Amino acid sequence: YRNVRKNKVSKKSGTNHRDILDISKMSIEEVIEYVRKRLENYNPQPVRRKEIPKENGKTRPLGIPTIEDRLIQQCIKQVLEPICEAKFYHHSYGFRPNRSTHHAVSRAMTLMNKTKLHYVVDIDIKGFFDNVDHSKLIKQMWSLGIQDKNLICVINKMLKAEIKGVGVPNKGTPQGGILSPLLANIVLNELDWWVSSQWEAFPTRKNYSKIRTLKSGKAYLDHSNKYRAMKESTKLKRMFIVRYADDFKIFCSSYEDAQKIFIATKQWLSERLHLEVSPDKSKITNLRKNYTDFL
């Protein structure tokens, strides 16, 4: 309840015209009992659709569940988040505990300046939140260890909650739901690890990594020897991904490498996640000659 109340959307009412102030009139015991009974045979209430204006003149659809459904989504999030955090890629920064846009930008600057990766692949996923494949998402949750069938059934019902004035969606996870950012990270976590497996997480026979200590006393794993050995003994190309929600960049060392990973990533997103890339918003940038927007 406290986490829902902190959310700026908490004072916005759903289709039943109730908000967080109505929930605050209930005792803790009443809230717990309400959630328990709803989950016994859960059916979400219709979602309110609201169009949010964008700078380019277009609008972004926001799906606002009822306050009661947001409360249940928060309960589920608090159970799932620790499980997912243990499996998420370490350079994904969006909507995660103790991570922010500053961390994402700092990582991007490190790759550009210290690692000398001056070519960046910018890929914009067309309408990401509106095009998430429900069946694929459920399979990804199962792979992460979320295998309680009752819980999966509840989440599946949330995904297919009726949007008032639109109907029942067959894909997508509406922006405005408390659970949506976590589900988005579950979907794109597979992309993170796929890109990482091409270089950063590529397995080697010998363990080259060493534990080193910063002046601050913080320990970290140094992979520089591993990367040096891979560069000398393989034809693999250096590449690193930095992601914040559905906004991500892949850093490469040459234009040729960037072209290959650009084509491969578009194909992978289409075949694995059934997502399309916006051709007019996706490009390769030489950072020594041009700038790139991030967040």
Task: Please give the residue ranges for each predicted region.
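Amphipathic alpha-helical blocks
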Residues: D22-P44
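Short acidic, Pro/Gly- and aromatic-enriched capping/linker segments at domain boundaries
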Residues: Y1-N7, I284-L295
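Non-catalytic, polymerase-adjacent accessory regions of viral genome-replication enzymes
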Residues: Y1-E29
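Conserved polymerase palm-domain catalytic core
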Residues: P46, H90-H91, R96, H103-L287, ...
